[in-house]
Amino acid sequence: MRIEPLIQGVVARSAHPYGCHASIKEQIEYVKKAPKIKSGPKRVLIIGASSGFGLAARIALTFGGAEADTIGVSFERGPSEKGVGSAGWYNNIFFKQEATHAGRTAINIVGDAFSDSVRNEVIEAIETYFEGEVDLVIYSLAAGVRPKPHSDTFWRSVIKPIGESVTGASILLENDQWVETTLEPATEEEAEATIKVMGGEDWESWIDTLINTESVAQGCKTIAFSYMGPEVTHPIYLDGTLGRAKIDLHQTSHALNLKLANFDGGAYATVCKALVTKASVFIPALSPYLLALYRVMKEKGTHERCIEQMQRLFTTKLYDQPKVPVDGERLIRIDDLELDPQTQAEVSHLLEQMNTENFKECGDYQGFKDEFMKLNGFNFDDVDYSQDISLETLASLKP
């Protein structure tokens, strides 16, 4: 069968396995040429390792100088009668192939990161492959739901404003349409559920588990990813349910920092730049900002994807420095290039002009959509998309 791109709204319903491999190789090539991580960690656990920042961090730490061995946890779908499976499934497979070829250990654990069974599997893998200890734990889950303990019910996250409704534009990638949407404010219950799913509680629970099983090495660090953004994004992001969850994550980093101080380690929330990811295209009213930001940062030569952000994080912030540089709230900031005042002034100017008629010319819509397609293995020049791929071949690939 031939695998074609299939998009519903802002959700990709297909992924191209060999395109996913091309994406992995492209990111590996970038970090091999970039400034090297000199004093990085050797044994890394990534919770949420199959796409976005988690995957980019895994690639950077393995191929960008640190030569790390990794255990990656993710919840992904393999091939079946229903379809070829998710991009993350193939990212896991081809990352492992490349890492193994380079002489590195790469263990993939596919399952629900909130479950006890997956935690037990991770502890066992740390014992087996890492001599019982990890040097770095990266928490990069982008889940929409979290099971309630000892129950059949779930907490569900929502992307909504708090207090008052917000009107803004979303862009449906399926048909390249600009759609005005109004989001009603979240209820208190919805805001609390979003904190449960996307806040710091599960991150802290993972670190507690690792401490209690004596799986934390001397000097062990942990990071989780956050976003704050400029004022124009605050109504839907920082002042909304997502922002509440991220503030909870920031507070958790301080509690974990105290716990890891016993091991001469540390915990940090890392504030990243706005990017096209599987998660970010879901956020209403963020798309026009991304189009304007991509255009301005590319024109200035400061644009970064996940992989550039992660390589810079490990070489200039988390490692290779006498001390981890943080802001007044003890956050690592790699959103500095995005929030440059001149960049933001130019972005604001574009947003004032942007509308349903001109968004493709006014912003970098082509770059925005291209990046989305590449998340799912499409739009790579060196991949033959006309080739037939059998489900049996795909089923033989194991993460």
Swiss-Prot record:
Pfam families linked to this entry: Eno-Rase_FAD_bd, Eno-Rase_NADH_b, Enoyl_reductase
Site feature: Plays an important role in discriminating NADH against NADPH: 76
Key words of the record: Fatty acid biosynthesis, Fatty acid metabolism, Lipid biosynthesis, Lipid metabolism, NAD, Oxidoreductase
Active site annotation, chain numbering: 237
Residues that bind NAD(+): 48-53, 75-76, 112-113, 141-142, 246, 275-277
Broad enzyme group: oxidoreductase
Catalytic activity: a 2,3-saturated acyl-[ACP] + NAD(+) = a (2E)-enoyl-[ACP] + NADH + H(+)
E.C. number(s) listed in UniProt: 1.3.1.9
Example of a GO MF term: NAD binding
SUPFAM superfamilies: NAD(P)-binding Rossmann-fold domains
Family: Belongs to the TER reductase family.
Protein name, UniProt field: Enoyl-[acyl-carrier-protein] reductase [NADH] 2
